[in-house]
Amino acid sequence: GQTIAFSYQGDIYTVPSSGGKARQLTTHPAHDTRPVWSPDGQRIAFASNRSGNFDVFLMNKEGGEPKRLTTHSTNEYPTTFKDNGHILYLANVLQDAKDIQFPGTRFMQVYEISTDGGRPDLYSSLYMENIALSKDGSKLLYNDYKGYEDPWRKHHQSSITRDIWLCTLGKDRSFQKVTTFGGEDRNPVWAADGASFYYLSEEKGSFNIFKKDLAGNSEKQITTHTTHPVRFLTSDNSGTLCYSYDGEIYTVKEGQKPAKVNILIVADKIENDVIHRLLTDGATDIAVSPNGKEVAFIARGAVYVTSIE
């Protein structure tokens, strides 16, 4: 819990959980995202499209050249470490023939791959988002994915909103639904006691952090943000929660007030603030201003305004 990994402008950074100057770990012009810590805190898995589509890469916590672990032609995203030597990730390689959406490419499966690389193994044909494994490895929490709803849409309630499930692992896996709100419940993480969990829910308005026991009872609200939704919930072994709110990173412990992590990023811009282009054709939907001195038009998918002169 001493260091936070995050993505900013397509690169992976780390910063002390107490705040301070961020350290840039990746510098590739491709998009690097979704960092995930190994249990021992020594390595970080992340997704990058530096080879075309998104693949799973692994690097040391100090940075350096990352190692590419997956090579499938579809996108692959790390979700959690199974242990220090294995990563669980999402991919759409071979959909289960029993799936109601078969054949299709929308619903991903969960695969397992060694940190040394090699051939991946199918971990679950069921689409499990935001997997959180228990410390003893006997259970996992996840949120389901039932349909094509935009994950950034706010306050909707429908038959395809996400719910939290508890999966007991073993030869015959068993599943228990632990949230029943008609809106969005997602992003579960284990509490330090191993008998309860935190998660994000819109039950009281915008996304906030809530807590329940594994039976789905004893609901308790942890944060009370109102203006914007809480996103990207994670936790460390001691029960400190970390999340994003309004473009900033916060930490909180149950019973305490959230604290913003003050981060200093010293980096060059990857794009120019203003891009000058000479357009000689392709303008559509032209509209002259009421005073006749300006004209608005569409070009290359953007709206432009220019002087008649």
Where would I find each of the regions flagged by the language model?
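Residue-level detector of Asp-centered blade-edge/turn motifs that repeat once per structural unit
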Residues: 39-40, 82-84, 135-136, 192-193, ...
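Short, surface-exposed amphipathic charged segments that create phosphate/polyanion-binding patches used
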Residues: 236-238, 276-278
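Signature of short aromatic-glycine-proline-rich micro-motifs recurring in repeat-based ectodomains
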Residues: 278-287
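A flexible loop/linker signature enriched in serine peptidases of the S9 family
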Residues: 2-17, 24-33, 39, 45-57, ...
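Non-catalytic extracellular/periplasmic "stalk"
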Residues: 259-263, 271-273
